């Protein structure tokens, strides 16, 4: 599985708990998107970013979509 190029977000693992508090393993996957961007004015590059990182970067100007 890929990871976020900026924050390093990866799949997280934990337990799923039923009402009886039985546990079974489960995972939470980040919402990764493959996008072509310029990060801090560098050359355009295809990277994996979470939707959250992409939204924040576009808003504060550190990421520019190509």
Curated annotation (Swiss-Prot):
Classification via SUPFAM superfamilies: L28p-like (SSF143800)
InterPro entries on file: Bacterial_rp_bL28, Ribosomal_bL28, Ribosomal_bL28/bL31-like_sf, Ribosomal_bL28_bact-type, Ribosomal_bL28_sf
GO molecular function: structural constituent of ribosome
Polar residues composition-biased segments: 13-25
GO biological process, alphabetically ordered: translation
Coiled-coil boundaries: none
A family per Pfam: Ribosomal_L28
Cellular-component GO terms for this entry: ribonucleoprotein complex; ribosome
Ribonucleoprotein among keywords: yes
Gene3D superfamilies reported in the protein's UniProt record: Ribosomal protein L28/L24
Keyword Membrane: no
Residue numbers spanned by region Disordered: 1-26
Keywords: Ribonucleoprotein, Ribosomal protein
HAMAP family listed in its UniProt record: Ribosomal_bL28
UniProt family annotation: Belongs to the bacterial ribosomal protein bL28 family.
Stored PANTHER family: 50S RIBOSOMAL PROTEIN L28, LARGE RIBOSOMAL SUBUNIT PROTEIN BL28A
Name of protein: Large ribosomal subunit protein bL28
Gene designation per UniProt: rpmB
């Amino acid at each position: 599985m890929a990871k976020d190029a900026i924050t390093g977000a990866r799949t997280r693992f934990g337990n799923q708990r039923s009402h009886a508090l039985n546990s079974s393993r489960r995972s939470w996957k980040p919402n990764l998107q493959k996008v072509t961007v310029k990060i801090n004015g560098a050359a355009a590059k295809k990277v994996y970013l979470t939707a959250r990182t992409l939204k924040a970067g576009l808003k504060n100007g550190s990421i520019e979509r190509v």
